[in-house]
Amino acid sequence: MSSSRQFLSSALRQCRAAGQRTAQFSTTSPAAAIRDIPTTSFQNAPRTNTNTSSPSSNNNNNAGSSQYKSDMFNLLNSGAGSRGGRDSYNNARDVDGGQRYGSNSQKVQELLQSEVTSNNYMRMMRRRWNNGDVYAPRDLSPYEMKGRNGGWVEAADVVDELGFSPLDNYRNFSLISDYITPFGRIRHSKETGLKPVNQRKIAKMVRRAIGLGIHPSVHKHPEILKNSNGRHLLPLVVPKGQKANKTKNFDGEDEN
């Protein structure tokens, strides 16, 4: 009988020792552990003692564990730790966010100011392009590229302002030449600035003149070419002692 009691008591002591050894290891993740928390507020709190089994010791253990939990709760909410509680964290975040916002806004202002200054200098930069110069669009300054895409548009409808009928002026070659391209295409209303009804009348006038054969369809009118000093005229090498006011066309015939 005594031997069985000794065996049971030794087995119980081994179980308690094994429980104490396993309790020393924590299963909490190191990333979730609370760092740098002072233990002054709960250093003297009683700990749970597994070696005693009396009712008084159980009451003391329950009181100690509840005191420990309350100390931890107060410590986390008061922000006494180095990481701070919720209020201190919010305050620090607001201060830090305000500083970051101020620095970012200052950087944006400096960037915009430098961009405006560089654009002003680039707009003041002008270059004289000569005939035959080869350049790419990226070589132009903003001042030089301004207005390249959009053409010149009439401010008002010329037909309504002057009050004439385009269909009655189909023999007016100067009027027709203003509303067609050098290759005989009718200009768009975006370029002419005419209303839709007047644009249709102008188009009908141009087609009528070309259809009757009184206006060329692929080049400017001969009268306009004759009075202009364009590339179609070639200078005539005149010998000494002769008049130098003559010019000849591509056919080799004298214009005058």
UniProtKB/Swiss-Prot annotation:
- Where composition is biased (Polar residues), the residues are 21-30
CC per GO annotation: mitochondrial small ribosomal subunit
The family database entries (PANTHER family) matched by this protein are listed as: 30S RIBOSOMAL PROTEIN S18, SMALL RIBOSOMAL SUBUNIT PROTEIN BS18M
Please name the InterPro entries in this protein's record: Ribosomal_bS18, Ribosomal_bS18_sf
From the Swiss-Prot or TrEMBL record, give the protein name.
Small ribosomal subunit protein bS18m
Keywords, sorted A to Z: Mitochondrion, Ribonucleoprotein, Ribosomal protein
Keyword Ribonucleoprotein in the entry? The reply is yes
- Disulfide bond positions: none
The superkingdom listed in its UniProt entry is Eukaryota
Recorded GO molecular functions are:
small ribosomal subunit rRNA binding; structural constituent of ribosome
Question: Which family, according to UniProt?
Answer: Belongs to the bacterial ribosomal protein bS18 family.
Q: What does this protein do?
A: Component of the mitochondrial ribosome (mitoribosome), a dedicated translation machinery responsible for the synthesis of mitochondrial genome-encoded proteins, including at least some of the essential transmembrane subunits of the mitochondrial respiratory chain. The mitoribosomes are attached to the mitochondrial inner membrane and translation products are cotranslationally integrated into the membrane.
**Upper taxonomic lineage:** Eukaryota, Fungi, Dikarya, Ascomycota, Pezizomycotina
Provide the gene name from the record.
rsm18
**What segments bear the compositional bias annotation Low complexity?**
44-66
